[in-house]
Amino acid sequence: MKRAGLLLLGMLAAVPAWAADLTVSAASSLTESFRELGAAYEKAHPGTKVDFNFAASGVLLQQISRGAPVDVFASADETTMDQAQQQDLLAAGTREVFAVNALWVVAPPQAKATPRTLKDLAGAGVQRIALGNPDSVPVGRYAKGALEAAGLWPSVQGRIITTQNVRQSLDYVARGEVDAGFVYATDAQAMPDRVRRAFAVPVPGRIAYPLAVTKASTQPVEARRFAAFVRSPQGQAILARHGFGKP
């Protein structure tokens, strides 16, 4: 009996005991960088496991507002985080911008004619344009705003293929299913051999990525520690490798 008890204890000791499980909801454009951040954080904090949920920022906000168990929220824009704050979903004093990005138009490598300006998107050589749903996808809002500012939205609206997130837009371009797509610079960097950078799109202000601990977090101390890690020199170096700029 004693041997059986010792054997059971040994088996339990062999099973990883996570001191804290963190759930991080992050914008789709953060997929590669945050996975690397999570691995580095777990290595630096043994006993902590970081689980990620990647989707469009607006979709993540809806999930959190409906009670999804989330400890940290990282959005691809300030607007979505503003909405989270207005709904009283964020822990006070935890919101902070941790990275910036840029907007690009990309095209399939095999495209006969690569657009070089926004005006080219209204030309005969471009018939299908991937663009994230402006209602829930920040990159879609940035892109629509740029097209409206250039007076081109009415000309290209009929060519828009609406996507659920920026990675879907990137995939459509990579597979040659569209002639062009709006993505972030970091997304284009993630598939350098499958998409061609056409041109950078100027946007007013900056494309800022804010992060905050949720008010409903069950691991508030660990969540704050993870947020601090993202902003630390090590975290910023990881983000920089994936093409993000410092805020």
Where in this protein do the model-derived segments appear?
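Exported/periplasmic ABC-transporter solute-binding proteins
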Residues: 19-45, 49-58, 62-66, 75-78, ...
